[in-house]
């Protein structure tokens, strides 16, 4: 957020890969800023779609007490009622948490059908480990911030069987051939692994898409700042990237829909695509 007034004054287009929608809204005040990543609003929409399919009517929220966690909580508050879901309990945790059993116990006592967890860092892994220690049978469904190898390695077997929102590139091999991101994800992952020896995470995909869009904007214009901004806003239509299918406009500088994310299930090897997504 601190960069926004700087790029606005300098009139330089900024592609800002963050979760919150406030970086691009209101668009009239954020005309130089675009969000090329999947946001918390899209992640929550995906969670609520899964809740509908699972028959969950009552959710609890467990979120990190930071901008990322609060963005997830705020989006859930905004969207839950429209999806026919009530929010029966909210609990937060600080970024340096080492024990989340008290919060989990309160959520359990609330009798919720599932717990929506939205956080980053080590405490997110502790949530699942503490849940196993408590023999908590309530499902825990995570936002897309946990869909990375660092979290998966830290949490170990405690997360197996739990649903988590993630980027299609993480499970590209299981995507149906009709999925618009199948081919571009395969190409990106193959090249990335050949160069770096590891599989990319979703953040690498966001950076790749951002760079490609900016480079194309420069090629298609004379490189003048305002023309680059205008090109991004007016010419990015049905742009199939690793992150999703982008459609920027004068009214929308986020440009993605919830189909830029998929629901995954954690397994012993990492993740697998939820059956209904195949």
Regions found by a protein language model. Give the residues of each.
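Extracytosolic ligand-binding ectodomains
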Residues: 1-278
């Amino acid at each position: 957020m601190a960069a926004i007034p700087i790029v606005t004054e300098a009139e330089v287009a900024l592609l800002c890969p963050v979760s919150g929608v406030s970086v691009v809204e209101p668009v009239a005040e954020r005309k130089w800023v675009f969000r090329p990543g999947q946001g918390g609003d899209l992640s929550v929409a995906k969670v609520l779609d899964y809740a509908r399919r699972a028959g969950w009517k009552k959710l609890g929220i467990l979120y990190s007490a930071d901008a990322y966690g609060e963005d997830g909580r705020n989006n859930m508050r905004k969207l839950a009622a429209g999806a026919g879901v009530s929010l029966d309990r909210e609990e937060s945790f600080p970024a340096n948490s080492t024990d989340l059993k008290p919060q989990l116990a309160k959520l359990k006592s609330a009798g919720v059908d599932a717990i929506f967890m939205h956080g980053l860092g080590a405490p997110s892994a502790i949530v699942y480990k503490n849940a196993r220690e408590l023999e908590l049978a309530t499902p825990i469904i995570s936002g897309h911030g946990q869909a990375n190898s660092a979290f998966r390695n830290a949490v170990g077997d405690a997360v197996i069987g739990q649903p988590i929102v993630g980027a299609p590139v993480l499970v590209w091999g299981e995507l149906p051939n009709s999925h618009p991101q199948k081919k571009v994800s395969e190409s990106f992952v193959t090249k990335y692994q050949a160069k770096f020896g590891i599989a990319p995470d979703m953040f690498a995909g966001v950076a790749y898409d951002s760079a490609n869009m900016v480079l194309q904007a420069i090629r298609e214009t004379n490189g003048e700042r305002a023309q680059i901004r205008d090109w991004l806003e007016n010419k990015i239509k049905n742009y199939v990237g690793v992150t999703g299918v982008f459609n920027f406009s004068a009214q929308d500088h986020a440009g993605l829909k919830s189909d830029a994310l998929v629901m995954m299930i954690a397994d012993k090897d990492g993740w697998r695509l939820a059956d209904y997504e195949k």
